[in-house]
Amino acid sequence: MHSRHKILVFVFGVLTLLWSSYLFILQIVDPFHFADERRIRYTPYKEILIPTRGSIYDANGNLMVSSISFYQIDIDRKAVSLWAKEKNISLNEAYNILSEAIGKNCSITSKQVLQRLTLNDKLTSVQITNKVREMELERILAEFEKNKLPGLTYSFASMKRIYSQELLAARLLGSVRAVSDGYDVETQSRSIYQLSGICGLESTYNKYLAGEYGWREVVFDAKHRRMPYPNLHEKPEKDGYNLHLTIDANIQAVVENALYEGLTKYGAKNAGAVIMDPNTGRILAMAGVSPDDKSLDPAEVRVRANIPVSFLFEPGSTMKPLTMLAALDRHLVRPNEYFECGVYYVQGRKISDTHMYGSLRPVDIISKSSNVGIAKIAERVGPKHLYEKLISLGYGQKTGLNLQGESSGMFAKLDNWDGYTLHSVSFGQGMAVTALQHATAFCAVANGGKIMKPYLVDYITDDNGNIVERTEPEVLRQVCSKAAADTVRSYMQAVVDRGTATHIKADYITIAGKTGTAQKAAEGGRGYINGKYTSVFVGMVPADAPKMVMVIFYDEPSPGYHFGSMSAAPTFKKILDDILFMPNCNIVAFDQRLIQSSKRMPDLIGKHIKQAEAILNQYGFSYKIEGAD
């Protein structure tokens, strides 16, 4: 046993001596030249591949949002020093060669590169810049590869979101921020960069836009050059999907410009608008603006609340057509019967009209906006059925759009109604709605009684242009008969033809609409604030078969403009005119538009020469172009 122990000790000693000798030969003699440029790092480094965030396009394919990636490039001074010795040139000469290779291929100059390389001799690795774009990086890498230059390393630095039209649809599109996901087991990295949506569409569709990380294994030689090596693994990144919106950027611009103009003219605190196709639920424009938006950085505006889905207002008299809808759908009123209007007392409260109208038919109750008349009709409907009708129209709940920040509005449960709630709700008091809710409800009046699910994204594509998801029009429910909806729409047409909105009547298209003026509720919902109003208008065109439903409102317009007929309705008309006279508009026939063109010169200010020519050609104007483009 003792001799076996001695043998083991002897064998172990011999092996130790051989291993030590082998290590000495490798480090001192270096027969395989591991110290030269053929030496590589056999332990692969895992490089994270950052996906590009998806883009956003309008309904016409115009780019609204895109991303630019930036990379950081560094120079390994030790690798450059080895290379300089091998080439028998000074270190300064080597730095000059590298500086020239970088400077001529990106925005930073050769002089700036050289300054950074020579600024601090104690640094082994020097950061040159972290603002190199992808195309610039490709040129720099090609230059280094072509001339076998040493020391260059690069890594992803950041991504910038580009909103190509700045303020346009800013609140709707939303914003992003850079975040780190922390430690990732697969890539074994601790700081995984990504842009994450924080509001608007950027937040709502973040999982589609964000993409998926990838990684690849890389090895380097002694001069920190990437080397080909067999059996390296990788998982390619997956770029984010692209959103193709229902929003028409041209219509969106028309709406926003009209609202900004209205804010100035009417002295309002905020304004909002929604335009929908009532037959599909497509949202053609969604805009919310405040007076100071244009003075702010667009990035600040993008994080502000999306007014059409978050701002609540009492709908006022624009609720009257929907109360009438509830009555007509149950055959509780006859078109030719009369209701005594003027003054009416309910539970000690006085309901009155702005004028002593006497007896009015249902159509005149809507066209003249009689509070008394609609309150009496609401009594026929009853609390239960009016409540159920308004719930079915979508009030007190979100629309199904699922847009970040959307409010469900305020609509009391039936159990909480008192003896006066039926009457106040009938003319739009005691409840609060969003512009989107209101537009969705009136789409049912426009399309024969169907509540359409509103949507903003038409389809989604991958980075190869393949459609991965498409939104199809969806009927959520039938809320009334077609006959009831058509009758209410004819009553709304009477509002424009001979009622409270005759000043927006057009010769070239029929308009159905309803004005509304609502006092602003005090904080906590108890009582109203003196002199504070919301001006509202709901309109649809053409009246006989609407292709467009629009809701406009102003928050606290100045006295005199607080009536819906004096601010919201004129804004509706301005927007309508500008949309109908846009090239390729199919809402009204070309020959009908020519009728109006003889009366009104289109606004061409700020238009590109080609766009201006297209508009003038469509009008049939003769014109002469002078000066440069």
What do the predicted segments below correspond to?
Residues Y42-T43, L243, I307-V309, N371-V372, ...:
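A short, structure-level motif marking secondary-structure boundaries and short turns
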Residues M1-L296, K384-G394, I504-D507, G524, ...:
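Periplasmic/cell-envelope proteins involved in peptidoglycan metabolism and beta-lactam response
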Residues V65, F220-E234, K238, I247, ...:
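Beta-lactam-recognizing serine transpeptidase/beta-lactamase-like catalytic domain environment
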Residues L312, L594-D629:
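Extracytoplasmic Gram-positive cell-surface binding/anchoring modules and repeats
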Residues Y344-G348, N586-R593:
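Substrate-binding beta-hairpin/strand module that engages nucleic acids
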Residues R4, E47, L312-F313, D364, ...:
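A generic secondary-structure micro-motif detector
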